[in-house]
């Protein structure tokens, strides 16, 4: 059995989990998330905890038990607390603003970039050069942040571009004669 899967996932107050043979659904104050299950891992709910047991003794089943436990733990955290990712816009004239369910970005192009947000994801702009992406699904929040960053990745000479708040951009030295 995977070392990660040995530990049960505790369900905090306000979070419910329902287990069907092919999927697990986690409901909480911030939304509902669904994860498909494989036949290699059995999930049981007892005393407000979810336990993961390997159905057969294959290497694949062992690996899937740890993966599934981590995914479900992220689902429980997401529907109770949520996830957020912060982006900074570094550059002269780089700005962001929220327009309904989209983020409008001015990134030095001749046109504005409008990025549509998927369902369940919210964005805030505390300042014109900061974007905070929030949502219950960790994968989707990270994906949206990566897509926005992809429009103008930080360049290595001046550091201009869209970067994660915790990202360190290593600045290269320019070529000398």
Curated annotation (Swiss-Prot):
Q: Which residues form a coiled coil?
A: none
Recall the GO molecular function terms of this protein's record.
Answer: rRNA binding; structural constituent of ribosome
Tell me the keywords, alphabetical order.
Answer: Ribonucleoprotein, Ribosomal protein, RNA-binding, rRNA-binding
Query: Could you tell me the superkingdom of the organism this chain comes from?
Result: Bacteria
A cellular component annotation (GO) from this entry = cytosolic large ribosomal subunit
Cystine bridges: which residues? none
- Gene Ontology process terms (BP): cytoplasmic translation
Q: Which InterPro entries match?
A: Ribosomal_uL6-like, Ribosomal_uL6-like_a/b-dom_sf, Ribosomal_uL6_a/b-dom, Ribosomal_uL6_bac-type, Ribosomal_uL6_CS
Give a yes or no for keyword Ribosomal protein in this entry.
yes
Q: Which PANTHER family match?
A: 60S/50S RIBOSOMAL PROTEIN L6/L9, LARGE RIBOSOMAL SUBUNIT PROTEIN UL6M
Enumerate the NCBIfam families for this protein: L6_bact (TIGR03654)
Q: State the similarity comment.
A: Belongs to the universal ribosomal protein uL6 family.
Q: How does it assemble?
A: Part of the 50S ribosomal subunit.
What the protein does comes down to: This protein binds to the 23S rRNA, and is important in its secondary structure. It is located near the subunit interface in the base of the L7/L12 stalk, and near the tRNA binding site of the peptidyltransferase center.
> This chain belongs to which protein, by name?
Large ribosomal subunit protein uL6
């Amino acid at each position: 059995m995977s070392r990660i899967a040995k530990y049960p996932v505790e369900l905090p107050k306000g979070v419910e989990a329902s287990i069907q043979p092919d999927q697990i659904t986690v409901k909480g104050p911030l939304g509902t998330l669904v994860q498909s299950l494989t036949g290699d891992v059995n999930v049981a709910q007892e005393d407000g905890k979810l336990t993961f047991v390997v159905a057969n003794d294959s290497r694949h089943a062992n690996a899937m038990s740890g993966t599934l436990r981590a995914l479900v733990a992220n689902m429980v955290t997401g529907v109770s607390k949520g996830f957020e990712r912060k982006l900074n816009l570094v550059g002269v004239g780089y700005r962001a603003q929220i327009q309904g369910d989209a983020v409008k970005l001015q990134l030095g192009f001749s046109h504005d970039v409008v990025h549509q947000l998927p369902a369940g994801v919210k964005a805030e702009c505390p300042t014109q050069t900061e974007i905070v992406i929030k949502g219950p699904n960790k994968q989707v929040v990270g994906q949206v942040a990566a897509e926005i960053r992809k429009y103008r990745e930080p360049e290595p000479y001046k550091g201009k571009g869209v970067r994660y708040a915790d990202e360190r951009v290593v600045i290269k030295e320019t070529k000398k004669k």
